[in-house]
Amino acid sequence: MSKTHFGFESVEETEKAKKVAGVFHSVASNYDLMNDLMSAGMHRAWKAFTIAQANVRPGFKVLDIAAGTGDLTKSFAKAAGPTGEVWHTDINESMLRVGRDRLLDKGIVTPSLLCDAEKIPFPDNYFDVVTVAFGLRNMTHKDAALAEMRRVTKPGGRVMVLEFSKVWDPLKKAYDLYSFKVLPWLGDKFAKDAESYRYLAESIRMHPDQDTLKTMMEQAGLDAVKYYNLSGGVVALHLGTKY
């Protein structure tokens, strides 16, 4: 049985999937509140930048992976319009349910699907844009997921990965203090769940840095891969094109 990491802990691959599922079942109901608290609302700006870079137009087909509460899905669905096709997907039933309900509450009628990014249930060359926001670091086989994202993207289409990344060195000390002390405290105080937010901090540190992820996307077969550092590298948006 192969080993992988769950935060800083070494676990069996099958065990990681169960542990990650447990984290997101736990945080689903407070997910948006905690995002606002943890990022001081900055996650909205990061997502807005991603939406602008996606440049979704009427009639586009878009796959939103690990879509959670549906922030990106909502904007993509509005941009694609009635002639488009936007899929709200997540591997976690609790997150999918919360996102689906919130989309419906906002008048967004678009399909929601339980979906494993390592085994995407769509044909080759189907989507104009494939996105994953704050989900790749939780996947056991990131290389397989990136290859699947490329497979279902049309020639000329784009794969976009918005994810926590490696902060600039001058920010590192303060960022570590915030991540390992403040985040678990916020999780405990507002969600009664310090452990899930401790995992968040650890999973960010274990995620590939900007250049490593760029190389992984290239190895998955994507071309013209580039990235933008946001908020001093706290987050990076990677983009790759399928030729």
Curated annotation (Swiss-Prot):
Superkingdom in the source lineage: Bacteria
Keyword set, alphabetical order: Menaquinone biosynthesis, Methyltransferase, S-adenosyl-L-methionine, Transferase, Ubiquinone biosynthesis
A biological process from GO: menaquinone biosynthetic process
Coiled-coil features, chain-numbered ranges: none
Extent of the signal sequence: none
TM annotation in the entry: none
Reaction(s) the record says it catalyses: a 2-demethylmenaquinol + S-adenosyl-L-methionine = a menaquinol + S-adenosyl-L-homocysteine + H(+); a 2-methoxy-6-(all-trans-polyprenyl)benzene-1,4-diol + S-adenosyl-L-methionine = a 5-methoxy-2-methyl-3-(all-trans-polyprenyl)benzene-1,4-diol + S-adenosyl-L-homocysteine + H(+)
Function description: Methyltransferase required for the conversion of demethylmenaquinol (DMKH2) to menaquinol (MKH2) and the conversion of 2-polyprenyl-6-methoxy-1,4-benzoquinol (DDMQH2) to 2-polyprenyl-3-methyl-6-methoxy-1,4-benzoquinol (DMQH2).
Name the record gives this protein: Ubiquinone/menaquinone biosynthesis C-methyltransferase UbiE
Annotated source species: Burkholderia ambifaria (strain MC40-6)
